[in-house]
UniProtKB/Swiss-Prot annotation:
Pathways involved: Nucleotide-sugar biosynthesis; CMP-3-deoxy-D-manno-octulosonate biosynthesis; CMP-3-deoxy-D-manno-octulosonate from 3-deoxy-D-manno-octulosonate and CTP: step 1/1; Bacterial outer membrane biogenesis; lipopolysaccharide biosynthesis
Gene3D superfamilies, per database record: Spore Coat Polysaccharide Biosynthesis Protein SpsA, Chain A
Family to which the UniProt record says this protein belongs: Belongs to the KdsB family.
EC numbers: 2.7.7.38
Top-level taxon in the UniProt lineage: Bacteria
Source organism of this protein record: Helicobacter pylori (strain Shi470)
Functional summary from the UniProt entry: Activates KDO (a required 8-carbon sugar) for incorporation into bacterial lipopolysaccharide in Gram-negative bacteria.
Keyword terms of this UniProt record: Cytoplasm, Lipopolysaccharide biosynthesis, Nucleotidyltransferase, Transferase
Name this polypeptide is given: 3-deoxy-manno-octulosonate cytidylyltransferase
InterPro entries: Cytidylyl_trans, KdsB, Nucleotide-diphossugar_trans
Length: 241
């Protein structure tokens, strides 16, 4: 099951999930991409999103406005839907309208092999890595996440030093091996790291849970601001979606 948490009043770009992407609301575009891989449900926090999904025949459920993260919203949706404890759950974002089907498939495959949860990342350049809106991730020897940060990591202390490994930009999608793991993660108390960086995935690392990271090729960009949307619409052609 793929669940897309969709919040209306995003702090940086209010109502963004309803913004038009070549004739379709952003969240609808995301859901249509997801439905190419598996059954998808949008977890809404507002009737306006719910009605938009229904208009375009996208399955949706109404959840609380008071969740602290998209993961918590996914869990409520899974409970409303009555998902079985052993069902895998993918958490995609309502602000990734250009996410390729191949990336979702890669996440699904990685989730099957991950004992706890999985996510994806892509190689980025130094200029891209400077943006705090593009989260960076560093990996251990087994391709599990060591840390996620809005800062540039790893930092090169010595001038002239060359990077031994590529910079990796996190793609904010998650796969949970089963619903019970989603419940386990949401039951953990928020940690100071996730509150400082505003990155919910740091809770799992803080409590020593493994996040497997699949490196993929992707041109997708997350839409965090109005500027992101304007730039993306210039880059992507409606014929490619």
């Amino acid at each position: 099951m793929i669940i897309i948490p969709a919040r209306l009043k995003s702090s940086r770009f209010e109502n963004k999930v309803l913004e038009d992407i070549f004739g379709l609301p952003m969240v609808v575009r995301c859901a249509k991409n997801a439905n190419l891989v598996d059954e998808c449900v949008v977890a809404c926090d507002d009737e306006s999103i719910m009605q938009t999904c229904q208009k375009f025949h996208i399955k949706a459920v109404l959840t609380s406005k008071h969740h602290n993260s998209g993961t918590e919203r996914c869990l409520e949706a899974a409970q409303i839907l009555g998902l079985k404890n052993d069902e895998r759950v993918l958490n995609l974002q309502g602000d990734e309208p250009f996410l390729e089907k191949e990336v979702i498939l890669a996440l699904l495959e990685a989730t099957k092999n991950a004992p706890f949860m999985a996510t994806c990342a892509k190689v980025i350049d130094e200029e891209q890595a400077k943006s705090p809106n593009l989260v960076k991730v560093v990996l251990d020897s087994q391709s599990n996440a060591l840390y996620f940060s809005r800062s540039l990591i790893p930092f090169l202390r010595d001038a002239g030093m060359k990077r031994q490994t590529p910079l990796l930009g996190h793609i904010g999608i998650y796969g949970f091996h089963n619903k019970e793991i989603l419940e386990e993660l949401c039951a953990l108390k928020p940690c100071v790291l996730e509150e400082l960086e505003k990155l919910e995935q740091l809770r799992a690392l803080y409590y020593q849970k493994k996040i497997a990271v699949k490196i993929v090729q992707s041109q997708s960009v997350g839409i965090d601001t109005k500027e992101d949307l304007q730039n993306a619409l210039k880059i992507f052609s409606p014929n490619l979606l």
